[in-house]
Amino acid sequence: MRLPIILDTDPGIDDAAAIAAALFAPELDLQLMTTVAGNVSVEKTTRNALQLLHFWNADVPLAQGASMPLVRPLRDAASVHGESGMEGYDFVEHQRQPLAKPAFQAIRDALMHAAEPITLVAIGPLTNIALLLTQYPECVFNIRRLVIMGGSAGRGNFTPNAEFNIAIDPEAAAKVFHSGLEIVMCGLDVTNRALLAADYLATLPTLNQTGKMLHALFSHYRSGSMSSGLRMHDLCAIAWLARPELFTLQPCFVAVETQGTWTAGTTVVDIEGRLGQPANAQVALDIDVEGFQRWAAEVIALAP
């Protein structure tokens, strides 16, 4: 039986690969997509998400979400993904529009009308998820688990200690980690190792239309290089859902720093239990890199 999921995303070049996997992995049933400001503005992430859904002719509703973090100004990652968020490929024009409701409302409605609890997958800043929990706290009973691409038990990639998705909206992340939800955290400890290798990247243009599109986007992606391999951060969250055996998880207490002058957005991951707090997340600390690469190639080959 396919696992029903809702994907909250901020496309983003590596988001495109994650969305492909969410659509075409046979284990998953993507029921709703929502967008959030992160890699670029929410207007751009929404446009990019709609372009991808049209590219794949996917019958998945999409709702536009938060345009700003809860309390902070938005800082984006256009330097990594390009000004539009998905530079490098000319998508055809389309008439698709987002739902006439905000993301947190769309998620709430999907959860409350579902026949079974749904897994949320958040591969951008956690603003929409925090808004959902604030406005509709009763929804926690309809959420099977939350799988996050974000955080780090070690170094950051946006500041010395903070990973981008958490650093953009630390207050939202803090609320989410203290929500009582069952959380799986796929952070930089595994995503920095989740490379698509250069020899595989070179085969993409001859694979299928999805391969051609991803190759064009990847050529403009600044998280690695086409010659040394590209980090597929967001794809890890989908990989865990489809192939959890590829990851080594450890239950940990995770706190999010919101006050530090230099450390805001840091995920304090208490691997050794020194803080004496109960675990609130399953944290991915290791990944079978070759297994991940095989799975990624398999799922991209399933796309048109």
Curated annotation (Swiss-Prot):
Citing just one GO molecular function, the answer is: purine nucleosidase activity
- Active-site annotation: H233
Q: Spell out the InterPro entries in the cross-references.
A: Inosine/uridine_hydrolase_dom, IUNH, Nucleosid_hydro_RihC_nonspecif, Ribo_hydro-like
A biological process (GO) of this protein is: pyrimidine nucleobase metabolic process
Pfam families assigned: IU_nuc_hydro
Which keywords does the record carry? Glycosidase, Hydrolase
**Can you cite an annotated GO cellular component?**
cytosol
Q: Which Gene3D superfamilies does the protein's record reference?
A: Ribonucleoside hydrolase-like
* The keyword Hydrolase appears for this protein: yes
Record flagged with keyword Hydrolase: yes
What SUPFAM superfamilies does the record point to? Nucleoside hydrolase
- Its EC number is 3.2.-.-
Domain of life here?
Bacteria
| CDD domains assigned | nuc_hydro_IU_UC_XIUA
Annotated NCBIfam families: PRK10768.1
Q: What is the annotated role of this protein in its UniProt record? A: Hydrolyzes both purine and pyrimidine ribonucleosides with a broad-substrate specificity.
Under the heading PANTHER family, the entry gives: INOSINE-URIDINE PREFERRING NUCLEOSIDE HYDROLASE, NON-SPECIFIC RIBONUCLEOSIDE HYDROLASE RIHC
The family note in this entry says: Belongs to the IUNH family. RihC subfamily.
User: Would you tell me the protein name for this molecule?
Assistant: Non-specific ribonucleoside hydrolase RihC
